[in-house]
């Protein structure tokens, strides 16, 4: 069976995502569309507005055949690490083609990735503490490969291409033109809105009828929503009670940020105010949110490394076509394929230990078990 894969967050699923899945299937002439989707937490450093099962269900109803979870250890990362986690998972699923939407589908992404293969991504080129890492990275890209575009989806596509190049058997890259509003912009264009706009409308109880598939309008209205508003008290408690030595063990903690975070938390009444207090030219808001989320979830560097050493494919759902594909490849996959979560998988040394730890807060807030005993949606 011909397969095409996509990496997504679906935060939440909307008409632009339905278009992207249809384009991927059409352009790749694929029988099966495999999606690696962020679990309950997303790259911008916050909980997804709906839990992973709700978002997977929406995707399966609108073009995806299989949805596999991108675990928190890969989902809440900077672009290159996010891309690596998603690309390796798709490759482990036996996917032939990697499709992604971009502002620049005409670009030869594989060629650019080869030019960047020897570019130094740390060291002297990244010692300007008045600029973010992303700004300095763009300068390195421009020097190494003449890259001047900085559109978010172009840069993410480039990260996909670099991760794909590192595979033993790279997938075919299939960039296609995005349609509608830009990444994280607010607004609506041709009945397609950014996920940011959809989240804004949902949280304000405004109608999303024009910008999400019709059958999802009432479905979304019934679901528990998640945001930093619910998580901030947990972050505050962690920062006020944890020892500095504990905070230094958190994944992505660097350069004395534990001092800055603990000094600024007492007076902050919400996440927005806290981020303004700790913001500097060196770090983007997304970088700081990711660190704050890692602190909240007690996501240590050790736990992240352990999870990466034991990769697995946690299937959230599949269609009949997806089931057929899984049955045909399940004995040939390099990674374990998980279709039912047992207690031993969630144990401290289990393959889903970090996912379970992170998801417990979602379960506490929403009252719906996220892992134990859950079977794939069908």
Swiss-Prot record:
Catalyzes the formation of N(4)-acetylcytidine (ac(4)C) at the wobble position of elongator tRNA(Met), using acetate and ATP as substrates. First activates an acetate ion to form acetyladenylate (Ac-AMP) and then transfers the acetyl group to tRNA to form ac(4)C34. The keyword Metal-binding does not apply. Disulfide bonds: none annotated. PANTHER family: TRNA(MET) CYTIDINE ACETATE LIGASE (PTHR37825:SF1). GO terms for cellular component: cytoplasm. It comes from Lacticaseibacillus paracasei (strain ATCC 334 / BCRC 17002 / CCUG 31169 / CIP 107868 / KCTC 3260 / NRRL B-441) (Lactobacillus paracasei). Keywords: ATP-binding, Cytoplasm, Ligase, Nucleotide-binding, RNA-binding, tRNA processing, tRNA-binding. Pfam families: HIGH_NTase1 (PF05636). It catalyses: cytidine(34) in elongator tRNA(Met) + acetate + ATP = N(4)-acetylcytidine(34) in elongator tRNA(Met) + AMP + diphosphate. This is tRNA(Met) cytidine acetate ligase. It is found in: Cytoplasm. Its main location: cytoplasm. Gene3D superfamilies: HUPs. GO terms for molecular function: ATP binding; ligase activity, forming carbon-nitrogen bonds; tRNA binding. GO terms for biological process: tRNA modification. InterPro entries: Rossmann-like_a/b/a_fold, tRNA(Met)_cyd_acetate_ligase. ATP binds at residues 7-20, 101, 153, 178.
């Amino acid at each position: 069976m011909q397969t095409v894969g996509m990496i997504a967050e679906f935060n939440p699923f909307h008409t632009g995502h339905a278009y992207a899945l249809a384009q991927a299937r059409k352009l790749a002439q694929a029988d099966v569309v495999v999606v690696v989707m962020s679990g309950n937490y997303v790259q911008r450093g916050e909980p997804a507005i709906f839990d992973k099962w709700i978002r997977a269900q929406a995707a399966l109803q609108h073009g995806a055949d299989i949805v596999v979870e991108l675990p928190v250890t890969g989902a809440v990362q900077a672009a290159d690490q996010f891309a690596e986690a998603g690309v390796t998972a798709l490759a482990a699923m036996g996917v032939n083609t990697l499709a992604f939407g971009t502002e620049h589908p005409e670009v030869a992404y594989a060629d650019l990735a080869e030019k960047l293969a020897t570019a130094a991504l740390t060291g002297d080129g990244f010692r300007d503490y008045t600029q973010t890492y992303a700004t300095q990275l763009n300068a390195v890209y421009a020097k190494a490969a003449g890259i001047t575009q900085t559109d978010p989806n172009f840069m993410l596509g480039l990260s996909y291409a670099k991760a794909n190049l590192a595979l033993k058997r790279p997938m075919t890259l299939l960039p296609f033109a995005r349609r509608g509003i830009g990444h994280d912009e607010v607004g609506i264009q041709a009945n397609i809105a950014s996920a940011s706009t959809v989240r804004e409308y949902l949280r304000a109880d405004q109608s999303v009828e024009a910008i999400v598939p019709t059958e999802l309008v009432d479905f979304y209205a019934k679901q528990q929503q998640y945001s930093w508003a619910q998580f901030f008290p947990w972050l505050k408690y962690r920062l006020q009670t944890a020892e500095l030595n504990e905070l230094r063990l958190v994944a992505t903690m660097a350069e004395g940020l534990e001092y800055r975070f603990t000094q600024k938390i007492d007076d902050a009444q919400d996440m927005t105010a806290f981020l303004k207090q700790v913001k500097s030219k060196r770090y983007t808001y997304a970088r700081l949110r990711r660190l704050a989320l890692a602190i909240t979830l007690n996501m240590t560097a050790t736990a992240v490394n352990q999870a990466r050493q034991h990769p697995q494919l946690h299937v959230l759902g599949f269609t009949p076509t997806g089931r057929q594909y899984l049955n045909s490849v399940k004995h040939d996959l390099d990674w374990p394929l998980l279709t039912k979560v047992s207690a031993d998988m969630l144990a401290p040394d289990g393959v889903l230990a970090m996912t379970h730890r992170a998801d417990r807060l979602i379960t506490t807030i929403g009252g719906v078990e996220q892992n134990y005993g859950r079977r794939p949606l069908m």
